[in-house]
Structures are given as structure tokens and as C-alpha cells.
Swiss-Prot record:
Residues 210-245 are annotated as: Disordered. Pfam families: Ras (PF00071). Present with 573 molecules/cell in log phase SD medium. This is Protein TEM1. It comes from Saccharomyces cerevisiae (strain ATCC 204508 / S288c). GO terms for cellular component: spindle pole body. GTP binds at residues 27-34, 75-79, 132-135. The lineage of its organism: Eukaryota, Fungi, Dikarya, Ascomycota, Saccharomycotina. GO terms for molecular function: GTP binding; GTPase activity. GTP-binding protein involved in termination of M phase. May play a role in triggering the degradation of G2 cyclin to inactivate M-phase promoting factor at the termination of mitosis. Acts upstream of CDC15 kinase and may be required to activate the CDC15 protein kinase pathway. It comes from the Eukaryota.
Length: 245
């Protein structure tokens, strides 16, 4: 007696889970937040982006085994008049990416204030520190390259944040930023090689001087580099980004 066929038409399709993950992009104006978002989601680069007015967002789906991950990426305009919209990009975000322009050291100094205000709104988000425009950095004086690299390493250590130098113009480390974000959120093992040589596009995510999610001696580390823990009330009045404290 023939055995009934169990062809493909009779198979039950695998059930896929879907998870939406919010990622906030914050930093000074014209550091490359929109450029990073559009490059990652649409693989498009345009050096003539206009400044973001308020908050922009795009979505991208990635798949891990039987799960579809929807990245909902929030891009906050860096002008001071949009600081009241900071909660849109930070509250509910699993990851907050702090961006600075590698060719403008003042934008790295501003990270102190961005971090203070963002952390006051969402102290459970995973921080990632990203230096943009690496393709322009390599044309600058080697002494400056070393200075900005070492200073950004100190910031990343205090924040206990992965540090990544990227270039949207040259497609350097763009995908890796979000792979690292995904791995940090879901505690996945990463095999991406780290890059920690001065002059190269830094990519450091393992040896951060503490446990994941900044759950180490936070108050002591912030004090040593002037990155302070915010007051317990997120609504308390704080200096605008760009004001060094």
C-alpha cells in the first residue's frame, strides 16, 4: 500500500516572530545622523542633505533565524530649538547612538550634554558612540587623528559604550553599527574583529572597562570625565546641547 505523499503544498509554513526595536540618533547638527540612517536603510548617500527639522524616522527589517527584527530609527535634529523633541528619539529606545563629527572636536565635547539629557529620559538604553566622516579624518594631521581617537576612547569608556568610526560616503562600518546594536540588545555573540589601532576606523565593543549596559561604578567614572549622572527628575531644566559643562 502506497504511503500518502507529504509534498511541499501540504507543509505548514514556519511561524515567524516579529519584534520592533527603536533606535535613537542624537548629536549636534550636521554630524551625519540623517546620512547614517538613510545609508543603512536605503543604501543611499547624498552629501547635500538638508538639516533635520524635528524628528525623522525610517524602518528596516532584518531577520535572525525565525525572527524578523524591525529597526525603527529616530533621527533628531541637532539644533537647540528641537531639544524639546528629545523624548521622541530616546524614550522607548533600546539603543541610543550618540554621533559626533571626527573633524569637529567640539561635537565630541557636546556628547557630554547629549548623554546627560538622554540618560535622564531613558537610563536603560544601550549607548553606542559613533564618530562620523572618517574619510575626512584620514586627511588631517596625524597628531590630531591621535588626539581625537584617544579622547573618543575615553568618552566611550566612561559611557561603557561601543566606539565605532564610520563613513557614509565610503560605506565604512555602517552595517556593523547596527549589527553591534542588535547583538547588545539580544545578547548575541559577535565575531566582528575589533579595530583599535590609531589611524584606522576604530571599532571597539568588547573591552569597555565594565559590564554591559553601564551597570558598573557609574558615578565614579562619570565624575572622572565630567559626564554626570542626571537628576532623578527628567523634567528638570538642563543646559542645551553644545554647552560644555
Amino acid at each position: 500500500m502506497a504511503t500518502p505523499s507529504t509534498g511541499a503544498n501540504n507543509s505548514i509554513p514556519a511561524v515567524r516572530n516579529q519584534v520592533e526595536v527603536q533606535v535613537g540618533l542624537v548629536g549636534d547638527a550636521q554630524v551625519g545622523k540623517t546620512s547614517l540612517m538613510v545609508k543603512y536603510v536605503q543604501n543611499i548617500y547624498d552629501k547635500e542633505y538638508t538639516q533635520t527639522l524635528g524628528v525623522n524616522f525610517l524602518k528596516r527589517k532584518v531577520s535572525i533565524r525565525s525572527t524578523d527584527i524591525i529597526f525603527s530609527i529616530m533621527d533628531l535634529g541637532g539644533q537647540r530649538e528641537f531639544i524639546n523633541m528629545l523624548p521622541i528619539a530616546t524614550v522607548g529606545s533600546s539603543v541610543i547612538i550618540f554621533l559626533f563629527d571626527l573633524t569637529r572636536p567640539e561635537t565630541l565635547s557636546s556628547i557630554k550634554e547629549w548623554y546627560r539629557q538622554a540618560y535622564g529620559l531613558n537610563d536603560s538604553a544601550i549607548p553606542i558612540l559613533v564618530g562620523t566622516k572618517y574619510d575626512l579624518l584620514i586627511d588631517l594631521d596625524p597628531e590630531y587623528q591621535e588626539q581625537i581617537s584617544r579622547t573618543s576612547m575615553k568618552y566611550a569608556q566612561v559611557m561603557n559604550a561601543p566606539l565605532i568610526f564610520c563613513s557614509t560616503a565610503k560605506s565604512i562600518n555602517i552595517q556593523k553599527i547596527f549589527k553591534i546594536a542588535l547583538a547588545k540588545i539580544f545578547n548575541l555573540t559577535l565575531t566582528i574583529p575589533e579595530i583599535n589601532e590609531i589611524g584606522d576606523p576604530l571599532l571597539i565593543y568588547k573591552h569597555l572597562g565594565g559590564q554591559q549596559h553601564r551597570h558598573h561604578n557609574k558615578s565614579q567614572d562619570r565624575k572622572s570625565h565630567n559626564i554626570r549622572k542626571p537628576s532623578s527628575s527628567p523634567s528638570s531644566k538642563a543646559p542645551s546641547p553644545g554647552v560644555n559643562t
